Structure formats: structure tokens, C-alpha cells
Amino acid sequence: MLLDDQLKYWVLLPISIVMVLTGVLKQYIMTLITGSSANEAQPRVKLTEWQYLQWAQLLIGNGGNLSSDAFAAKKEFLVKDLTEERHLAKAKQQGGSQAGEVPNPFNDPNMSNAMMNMAKGNMASFIPQTIIMWWVNHFFAGFILMQLPFPLTAKFKEMLQTGIICQDLDVRWVSSISWYFISVLGLNPVYNLIGLNDQDMGIQAGIGGPQGPQGPPQSQVDKAMHAMANDLTIIQHETCLDNVEQRVLKQYM
């Protein structure tokens, strides 16, 4: 089967361009209606303690890429800070609540803002997708756009040939509405390339809304800091930079 070359100019490219532009527009609309990023809803002290825990985890996982002196300096600094709890956010005691008690999330003013931003994010994702799906179904229904260059099993036929009633058609042929669904699920690398955040543009963001960094509960942060400091203390450092000159010379000479 041969396809008209004009299909890629009048069907394939318009759908792809509209999908990319809609994603960019949705990103700016999300920024406008939510007012700021998700991190700004978190107190600065909470972000600081979370970042120090992340820093310690990264040092444990990637310390082999550092020299022994650099690792020892970073290890000493982090162990001292985590042990002394310099960056621990002190919870405010309200209404006679005891220290270490898990706070009620419904009393947190940031919770209502997060739920409202979640609802706004769902609307900002649902409305454009509905409009574009109607546009594709109305103007490009029944078009076969391309043939995939790799073989597929028959289970992909229903997904790739939506709107095409032809039982004998090869499963590699893709219809217009199926190309729309593929674009919805597969445009995150394109958004990353043009500088947009894939967490905000992905399908997960349309369901759950943007989320800030999630650290341990307030009552367990101090325990997590001491545990991380203990892990840093007992870790055995092995750097990949030892004898690197001899290994390079041995490989290329």
C-alpha cells in the first residue's frame, strides 16, 4: 500500500506541531494559574533539610568519583552538620501538640493551596486534550499516516489503528487518532529539548499536579539525619581515580 506524500504535510505535521505548541502553551498557563512553582509552597527550612539529606545520599552513591581528600572533606562537613542538626526545621507547637507528634495535614495552610493547584492542573490538562481530540477526530478521521519501520505483534493493532476498520491491514500502519495518543504519551523528550519541565508536561502532571520534594515526616527528620550521618561515618571509600594514570597508559600503549 502506498500513501500520498501530501498526508505528512497536511495531516502528520499539523497534528505534531499543534501538540507541541499546546504543550508549551499549557506549561505557561499552568505557571500563570498556579502562580509559582511547587517548591515555593514549601518553607525554606524544609527545603534546606531535604536538600542536605539528598546531598548525603548523593555523596554515598557517587563518592567513588571523588578523590580521597575531597570525599573526606565533604564527609566531615556533612557528618558534623547532620549530627548537630544545624539545618533541622523546628516544628512549632500549636494547640498543646507535643513535640514529635505528626501534624494534621488539614490544618496546614499549604494543603489547600496544593489541592487547588492540583485541580487547576487537571483542568489545564483535560480541556486542551479534549479540544485537540475533537479536532483530530473531526478533520482527520480515517487517515492512515505512516508505517512504522519495525515489526509489531497483533496486540498493537487496536492501539495503532483506532478509527480504521480493516482487519487485513498490517499492524505497523498508524492512524491519525492513534498518532495523537502516541504524541500525548511520547512528547516529553521534545519538551525537555526546548527547555520545559517534563514533570509538569508529562501525563503524571495532568493527573496529580506538580509536586514539591517529599522528604521524611517532620517527626522522623532528626532520625533520618542521624542515620545518614552514621552511614557516612562507616562507609568505606574506594575512588576510581586511584592509579588512573597507569590504567590509561596500560590501555592505550
UniProtKB/Swiss-Prot annotation:
GO biological process: protein folding in endoplasmic reticulum
Coiled coil: none
Membrane topology according to the record: Multi-pass membrane protein
PANTHER family membership: ER MEMBRANE PROTEIN COMPLEX SUBUNIT 3
GO cellular component terms listed in the entry, alphabetical order: EMC complex
Subunit note: Component of the ER membrane protein complex (EMC), which is composed of EMC1, EMC2, EMC3, EMC4, EMC5 and EMC6.
Record's keyword terms, sorted: Endoplasmic reticulum, Membrane, Transmembrane, Transmembrane helix
Subcellular location: Endoplasmic reticulum membrane
Transmembrane segment boundaries: 10-30, 126-146, 176-196
Sequence similarity: Belongs to the EMC3 family.
Role according to the record: The EMC seems to be required for efficient folding of proteins in the endoplasmic reticulum (ER).
Protein name in UniProt: ER membrane protein complex subunit 3
Main subcellular location of this protein, as a coarse class: endoplasmic reticulum
Organism: Saccharomyces cerevisiae (strain RM11-1a)
